[in-house]
Amino acid sequence: MQGWKGGDTHIEHDYEYQGGMGMFWGLVGQNHQMIKTYDAKHGSWLFSDMPYFGRWNPHRPDDECYWRICKNSVHQRDIFRNDPPDRFDKFGISIAKKRVKGDEIILCPSSNNMHILVGNMTQRDWILSTIETIQKITDRPIRVRHKPRKNGTSGPHVADIPFAEDIKNAYCVVASASMASVEAIINGVPVVTTSNHNPVTSLGISCIEAVDWYPDEAKNICNTLAYSQFTSKEMYSGFAYEMCGIR
């Protein structure tokens, strides 16, 4: 693959290991099981999927778009690297100036395959167990917001209510590995998580009554996430390879 060092690239439809580092795109098919097997047997792997910013939009298919690439995780977990702001700033996204102080705890489940991969449970079980845990700590109202899906596709472009609008009365967002975590901190909403694969926080549910939000921290996290996603040109040039820290 152009821009990717280390010899030949194999597309392993038969899932037979042929050496080198494995790379998985999304959780299509049995990728969630393959990642677990690969991690146990062969070590380091890469994961690519939708980006944190600059997502491909089917309504504007010719626009430049990005894809996140993460090493040994479905998300960038080293979120306090103090990366420069240039890549994030080019998107023109404004970080909220103050915290949203609403009432609702909003659960944002990931896909069923994602929950199986990062939490060894189904989406339904995650929702039920998370609600049960939260209710032992607080009596705040809880609402589940599923990822928008319509006409065989998913994502922000098919949402009936934009996420930023839907969290205007949020106290916090609870997620495992959902991309909604990123949009939450951009909009001034704190996040707590149930896994170590969350792209913006490591705070668990036990911290839910003390959770807070800081604009400078949100901006620094977004700066790092913008350095964890790449255009096709940046993959061809070798920039993505270098930024992924592959040795």
Regions found by a protein language model. Give the residues of each.
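Conserved catalytic-core segment of nucleotide-activated headgroup transferases in glycan assembly
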Residues: V100-N151
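Leloir-type glycosyltransferase catalytic cores
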Residues: N57-G102, T201-R247
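Short, solvent-exposed loop/turn segments at secondary-structure junctions
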Residues: L27-Q30, P51-G54, S110-M114, P148-N151, ...
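Secretory-pathway glycan-assembly enzymes, especially type II membrane glycosyltransferases
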Residues: M1-F91
